[in-house]
Curated annotation (Swiss-Prot):
Its main location: cytoplasm. Residues 3-181 form the Guanylate kinase-like domain. This is Guanylate kinase. One of its GO terms (cellular component) is cytosol. ATP binds at G10, P11, S12, G13, A14, G15, K16, T17. It comes from Thermotoga maritima (strain ATCC 43589 / DSM 3109 / JCM 10099 / NBRC 100826 / MSB8).
Length: 207
C-alpha cells in the first residue's frame, strides 16, 4: 500500500509547526517533508531538519531542473518542496506531511487530487495578530507582511478538506491525529487487505 500525502496549511502564527511536531511523535510511519527556503535561519532552527537553507541562486537552479513538487515566493522568500523526497517515501508506504503556504497547497491540489488538505486556523484574526506580534523574532516590516498575507490566506479555508481551529494545542493535535487515522482506514487505501479477505473467504469450504 502506498503512503498518503497530507498538506497542512495555515497563516503564519496559527501553530502549524507545533501541531506537526506533536503529530509526528504520536503516529508511526509518518515523515515530515523538509522544504527548501531562501529565508534566513532563525536561532532555534536546524539546517536539514526544519528547512534546507539555500541561496536564491541555488533555489532557481533547482526550479530549472524540475526538482520541486511545488514552489512559491512567500513573505519575500522562496520556498519549495522536493519532489524526490515526497515520491520516494510515498512509494515506500509512508505518509508524508507537508507544511506549506496556500499558494503551494493550491498548486499541489491541481497535480495530486488524492492528497488530504488540512487547514489550521486561529480562533480569530485578532488572536492571530496578537500571536505574531508577541513572537518578536522578525523586523516590524516583516511582521506587517505576514499579517497582510494572513488576511489573504484565511480567505481560502473552504478549498481544504478539513479545518482545525487551534484554540488549544492538545485538542488541535488530537484532531489532526484523528484525521490521519480516519484517512488510513478508508476503503480506497485498504484494497490489498480487502482482496486478501475475499481470497480467504473464497478458499473456505462450506460446512
Amino acid at each position: 500500500m502506498k503512503g498518503q500525502l497530507f498538506v497542512i496549511c495555515g497563516p503564519s502564527g496559527a501553530g502549524k509547526t507545533s501541531i506537526i511536531k506533536e503529530v509526528l511523535k504520536r503516529l508511526d510511519n509518518v515523515v515530515f517533508s523538509v522544504s527548501c527556503t531562501t529565508r534566513p535561519k532563525r536561532p532555534h532552527e536546524e539546517d536539514g531538519k526544519d528547512y534546507f537553507f539555500i541561496t536564491e541562486e541555488e533555489f532557481l537552479k533547482r526550479v530549472e531542473r524540475g526538482e520541486f513538487l511545488e514552489w512559491a515566493r512567500v513573505h519575500g522568500h522562496l520556498y519549495g518542496t522536493l519532489r524526490s523526497f515526497v515520491e520516494s517515501h510515498i512509494n515506500e508506504g509512508k505518509d508524508v506531511v507537508l507544511d506549506i503556504d496556500v499558494q503551494g497547497a493550491l498548486s499541489v491540489k491541481k497535480k495530486y487530487s488524492n492528497t488530504v488538505f488540512i487547514y489550521v486556523a486561529p480562533p480569530s484574526y485578532a488572536d492571530l495578530r496578537e500571536r505574531i506580534l508577541k513572537r518578536g523574532t522578525e523586523k516590524e516590516a516583516d511582521v506587517l507582511v505576514r499579517l497582510e498575507n494572513a488576511k489573504w490566506e484565511l480567505m481560502f479555508m473552504d478549498e481544504f478538506d478539513y479545518i482545525v481551529v487551534n484554540e488549544n494545542l492538545e485538542d488541535a493535535v488530537e484532531m489532526v491525529v484523528s484525521i490521519v487515522r480516519s484517512e488510513r482506514a478508508k476503503v480506497t487505501r485498504n484494497q490489498d487487505k480487502i482482496e486478501r479477505f475475499k481470497m480467504e473467504v473464497k478458499g473456505w469450504k462450506k460446512l
